[in-house]
A protein has these predicted regions:
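Charged, low-complexity intrinsically disordered terminal segments
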Residues: 25-178, 182-524
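Bacterial N-terminal signal peptides that target proteins for export
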Residues: 2-13
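Bacterial N-terminal signal peptides
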Residues: 12-23
Length: 524
């Protein structure tokens, strides 16, 4: 999900305008000529040589965990600047803000050097960026496609759905994947979209998130996944959706004017080493990649999941099952970070089965005050008591305690929100990716994930999650009466015990009270 007010609430408020706005609109135009293309796998580029020099075995996969937002943004821009053959880029959201414009400039600059750029963006949050995407496509070596696009009503998210109301069931399915592949040999994947709040650059609220850079054995599968989405019938050339009014030279000038705001990557305070001791990627590439090695499998929903007409059909191809199957097979411990955590009855039963086998289960999710989509919290809260009675340890992130934890680098006085999607199973198997443990990831959106077997990577992920649990979260537990809940945390002045949802405003409570019971879990 993106950082935004709730889509469904906005749509509901605007529902009365539907009749006025729908007429004459409904379906995306058919694109008869949609050329297919495949990933380019470089063996002689500088990036390829750096990977080859660091790899102990070409069948193994190397990992560089990136919990720091500044470092993660730097890695993307660094890869774009060093690519010589290809950049394959797939995101749910690229915002038209400082970070989005910096990222888009890096793609343009690569194309000007002769790098083939394929950019695939979901069409839900392209509001304010239509021209930017269309104009980038006017450059040589660049193709831009929109996934599952809306035909019209492009002024806002609400008007997109209203203007396409007859196709709501289809358009409600979104591409939530996040992936960047450079020269076919290095990839960055994980939870981050491209916007200020994902890289600790927003003055108001920022996400605690996690990405991973990967090389080696898993790359062939990642290339195949990208190609499957790029060549799917749901990926439409941007110029077929956002109609241009000028020639290619005009569009290029407009793009340059829109994105060249003077900010350079060097102005971003990338730490000399992050909380895990990792150097900026440029130094890693120049001085030798210091990676954790193991085995890995990448997985994704098939693009046609968005065409599923029933929940059962969508679940039959759900990438989420790759995670839950491994979680359910755990023998000792499961540690989960899921910002949007709506387990449903089957998920609760799966966790109950685990704790019944003496498997220790701990889940970190957002508190009501921390979540960017308060209605999702109702889907979690309705299962909270059952989970606690089953023996699951629950931790809820505080939005205001985050800036006290220097290692997580949430800027002082901004709100902290959890966005990392990760799990560690038996201290050796790691999941990282875009998949939330909620109903939308299960049966609505397409997702991308990675399952890695590496005790060292597992230790790093556990350490990062523990930082948030220890200094920035409330532990949810039963009060002395064994029925009501309380939220426990430690502070500089002693223990804190609260008996109501911590830091939540009356408006949050009212919104959930009024709308929560009526929103189907498939929409959360």
């Amino acid at each position: 999900m993106a950082s935004s007010s709730d889509v469904w609430l906005s749509s509901a408020i605007a529902w009365g305008l539907a009749v006025l706005l729908v007429s004459g609109c409904g379906t995306v135009p058919v694109v008869p000529d949609r050329p297919t293309s495949g990933a380019l796998h470089s063996v002689d580029s500088p990036l390829a040589r750096s990977v080859q020099a660091s790899a102990p075995n070409p069948a193994m996969t190397g990992f560089l965990l990136m919990p720091n937002g500044f470092s993660s943004l730097d890695a993307r821009v660094e890869l774009a600047s060093r690519a010589v053959h290809s950049l394959d880029v797939q995101y749910y959201l690229i915002a038209n803000d400082r970070t989005g414009r910096l990222f888009m400039r890096s793609l343009r600059d690569a194309a000007l050097r002769g790098v083939r750029v394929r950019l695939l963006v979901d069409d839900l949050y392209t509001i304010g960026g239509d021209d930017m995407f269309r104009d980038l496509a006017a450059f040589e070596n660049v193709e831009v496609r929109l996934f599952n696009p809306f035909c019209c009503g492009r002024q806002s998210v609400a008007t997109k759905f209203i203007a396409s109301i007859t196709a709501f069931e289809h358009l409600n399915h979104r591409m939530h994947n996040k992936l960047l592949i450079a020269d076919g040999v290095v990839a960055v994947m994980g939870g981050r979209n491209i916007a200020d709040e994902y890289f600790a650059r927003s003055p108001t609220s920022n996400f605690v998130d996690m990405d991973v850079l990967v090389v080696g054995g898993v790359m062939q599968r990642l290339r195949d996944i990208f190609d499957a989405y790029w060549n799917s019938r749901e990926a439409h050339p941007v110029e077929a959706i956002v109609i241009a009014t000028g020639d290619r030279h005009d569009l290029r000038r407009a793009f340059d004017h829109a994105v060249d705001d003077g900010e350079q990557m060097r102005s971003i305070p990338v730490p000399a080493t992050d909380m895990l001791g990792h150097r900026p990627l440029g130094r890693e590439l120049d001085e030798g990649l210091q990676l954790v090695w193991g085995t890995a499998v990448a997985f994704a929903d098939r693009p046609e999941k968005v065409n599923a007409t029933t929940v059962e059909a969508a679940r039959a191809m759900s990438a989420q099952m790759n995670i839950m199957d491994r979680v359910s097979a755990s023998a000792r411990s499961v540690v989960i970070s899921s910002p949007y955590f709506v387990p449903g009855p089957s998920g609760v039963q799966a966790f109950r089965d685990l704790t019944g086998r003496d498997v220790k289960v701990a889940v970190l999710t957002n508190s009501l005050a921390a979540t960017d989509v308060p209605l999702v919290h109702t889907g979690y809260a309705r299962y909270r008591t059952e989970l606690l009675r089953s023996g699951v340890d629950l931790y809820e992130l505080s939005p205001t305690r985050m800036f006290r934890t220097d290692e997580l680098l949430v800027p002082a006085m901004s709100l902290g929100r959890l966005h990392s999607k990760a799990a560690v199973i038996d201290e050796s198997i790691v999941y990282l990716g875009s998949v939330n443990l909620d109903q939308r990831s299960d049966s609505t959106n397409t997702e991308l994930g990675l399952l890695a077997e590496s005790p060292e990577l597992a230790r790093q992920v556990i350490d990062v999650i523990a930082m948030a649990q220890r200094g920035s979260s409330y532990r949810v537990r039963f009060a002395r009466d064994g029925v009501s809940l309380e939220w426990f945390a430690t502070s500089d002045i002693g223990d804190v015990i609260l008996t109501q949802e911590p830091e939540a405003t009356p408006l949050m409570h009212l919104q959930n009270l009024l709308f929560g019971p009526f929103v189907p879990e498939q929409l959360l």
